Amino acid sequence: MHQVEEIILIVENLAEVRGKTPHYRHLYVQVLAAIAVGILLGYFYPDVGSKMKPLGDAFIMLVKMIIAPVIFLTVATGIAGMTDLAKVGRVAGKAMIYFLTFSTLALLVGLVVANVVQPGAGMHIDPASLDAKAIATYAEKAHEQSVTGFLMNIIPTTLVGAFAEGDILQVLFISVLFGISLAIVGKKAEAVVDFLHALTLPIFRLVAILMKAAPIGAFGAMAFTIGKYGVASIANLAMLIGTFYLTSFLFVFMVLGAVARYNGFSIVALIRYIKEELLLVLGTSSSEAALPGLMNKMEKAGCKRSVVGLVIPTGYSFNLDGTNIYMTLAALFIAQATDTPISYGDQILLLLIAMLSSKGAAGITGAGFITLAATLSAVPSVPVAGMALILGIDRFMSECRAITNIIGNAVATIVVAKWEGELAPAQLATTLAGKAPVETMSGLSSQRSDTVELGQKVLFGATNSADRTLAGRPGGRDSRRIAPDHSAQVFGGPLSL
């Protein structure tokens, strides 16, 4: 017993030390500084800045490397702990209803804003004068997309192939099936479930280690963007960029804000809570970079693991609010800029096609542009060659698309969890208010109690199973079951400095 108390005292001391961490050690501050330095380098030394692209690409590759195991462990263990397997279908069904509703609403918002503001009016550009070769690659990829092909691609060729390719929907498909099989097998699969729970510790520790490279990735990506495309490209099409950013801002704070308020939480508090993930997306233009951290934070905010594991990965393909706003807004901008008349009937056709083509857009940089090409290819009234107009500024709008997508998926997770009764309202309220302990993506605890709580979980081997719940103090009902290897993890696991 004394040994346990000594270990917990060490954990508390570690927490006190970490509570004094200076601001410059926080990941979001480092990412902000890296973005600023990247902008300056790209602006003053564009040749050097344009060569920084490998830094951003390398960081994205590192994160994508860990996404598959994070999704698998989260989904499989979450579903395995369900006593009612019908709940999996209910969660998926409610999530799809939410996705369809708000994705369509985002498309409509982009359409309405484009008609009211008309950002492309007065440009009088002849489509024949545009360089169609510049968008040939995107158009070719767009033609390869089809609804049937997208659905068939969800089924991997082999079990291992999904993890090798890193396809989010394929990994999610396998994870759901594996989690269901574990739940059906029941007690005989407890050893496997315990192993998966234990495996989450080093995997999420690896995520924290990889996130330490986030400032380098953000610096490289931003330096490349400014160095290659320059600030002049922003000025030339400032009306479109400004309209898109303002529309996304209003969608987040008015539409999603109303949804959040109706469901009992603040959109501002939620954005503050996931600020590290948003800054990471801002620096890398890739929403995939924030997926592991977002899943972790949504679970800590009180959403059940099974809901988080289903909603967020699925939302990365089916709930892309920012991409949807961009698609209809950009399509009408091209029509206005090239003086192409587009009737309300054409706009309805555009809306219907966009509802289909927007599903399955990947969370990587440039995916929105490919999806736009697929949409315009099916709408004969809008010249596809007009996409050359926005090719140079697409990178600058990619950040806003990705940030809006991330916020939309965070809201969706909380809402679906509440609909399903898998949300802890008190935990959500205290977490968003900043009163609850939050383990950041950098792996450092933001409050003293967080380190104590994490240490207790490691010490007592706590899992999601009810029989492993920690009493919360030395001498509690589970303290007598401490194993030597569990206590050793304090010094080699998540709490090691």
UniProtKB/Swiss-Prot annotation:
Protein's recorded name: C4-dicarboxylate transport protein
Regions that span the bilayer: 27-45, 60-82, 95-117, 168-185, 205-227, 237-259, 348-370, 374-393
GO biological process: L-aspartate transmembrane transport
Function per UniProt: Responsible for the transport of dicarboxylates such as succinate, fumarate, and malate from the periplasm across the inner membrane. This transport system plays an essential role in the energy supply of tropical rhizobium-legume symbionts.
Region (Disordered): 466-497
Ranges of biased composition (kind: Basic and acidic residues): 475-484
Principal location listed in the UniProt entry: membrane
GO molecular function, one term: succinate transmembrane transporter activity
Pfam families linked: SDF
Triggers of expression: By succinate, fumarate, and malate. Expression depends on the RpoN sigma factor.
HAMAP family xrefs: C4_dicarb_transport
NCBIfam families documented for this protein: PRK01663.1, PRK13027.1
Topology of the protein relative to the lipid bilayer: Multi-pass membrane protein
Gene Ontology cellular-component annotations: plasma membrane
Family: Belongs to the dicarboxylate/amino acid:cation symporter (DAACS) (TC 2.A.23) family.
Record key words, sorted: Cell inner membrane, Cell membrane, Membrane, Plasmid, Symport, Transmembrane, Transmembrane helix, Transport
InterPro entries attached to this UniProt entry: C4_dicarb_transport, Na-dicarboxylate_symporter, Na-dicarboxylate_symporter_CS, Na:dicarbo_symporter_sf
Subcellular location per the Swiss-Prot or TrEMBL entry: Cell inner membrane
